[in-house]
């Protein structure tokens, strides 16, 4: 059962994706994409938004929180081109603890911060991009969207070069919540500059601690 608070924040997320079109800068990439990775898909809004612009792309949807995953399944189950994974992308495959923000599940994380101060533990499955790509025999990923609540550094700063080479366009919600994460962002930013000829930064309208990073080879 979805609480009133959860419903409120889900409506806000829906508004950001469909009305404000927070990911407007990905439209051209999505239109021509054959494979899209929605890494932390929450209840499925970004995947639905992608489907609005591309009816044929194969979408890999990742959501670790069981309640959110089940809600997404109710919406996306009849689309046979969306592959649903009840996993969190990490730098190693394991079963571990997620710090769940019950009201705003999209602000849950492996780590604690002001975004999830009153977390409760939930055991979830973690898996690497390398394992997903290998087990599904994927040679190229046209669009990767990552919003994994300041675990982006743990994943991307440890990502194998073979996987970097398969990503054509990458959109990351970057969380610079402290000095250590700022240092991690500097490392990741240098990697993005070396991998992709086109890079752009969009500042969050809500806080200077969060930004959207867009990188593409096209």
Predicted regions and their residues:
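Phosphate/nucleotide-binding beta-alpha loop and adjacent structural elements of enzyme active sites
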Residues: 1-218
């Amino acid at each position: 059962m979805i609480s009133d608070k959860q419903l409120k924040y889900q409506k806000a997320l829906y508004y950001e994706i469909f009305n404000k079109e927070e990911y407007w800068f990905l439209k051209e990439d999505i239109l021509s994409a054959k494979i899209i990775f929605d890494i932390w898909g929450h209840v499925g809004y970004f995947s639905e938004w992608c489907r609005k612009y591309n009816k044929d792309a194969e979408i890999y949807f990742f959501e670790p929180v069981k309640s959110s995953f089940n809600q997404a399944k109710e919406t996306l189950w009849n689309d046979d081109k969306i592959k649903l994974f009840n996993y969190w992308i990490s730098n190693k495959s394991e079963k571990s603890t997620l710090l769940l923000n019950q009201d705003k599940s999209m602000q849950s994380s492996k780590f604690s911060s002001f975004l999830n101060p009153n977390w409760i533990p939930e055991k979830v499955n973690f898996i690497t991009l390398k394992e997903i790509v290998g087990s599904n025999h994927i040679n190229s990923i046209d669009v990767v969207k990552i919003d994994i609540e300041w675990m982006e550094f743990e994943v991307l700063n440890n990502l194998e070069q073979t996987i970097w080479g398969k990503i054509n366009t990458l959109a990351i919600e970057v969380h610079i919540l402290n000095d250590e994460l700022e240092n991690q962002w500097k490392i990741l930013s240098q990697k993005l500059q070396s991998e992709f000829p086109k890079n752009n930064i969009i500042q969050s309208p809500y806080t200077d601690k969060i930004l959207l990073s867009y990188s593409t080879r096209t």
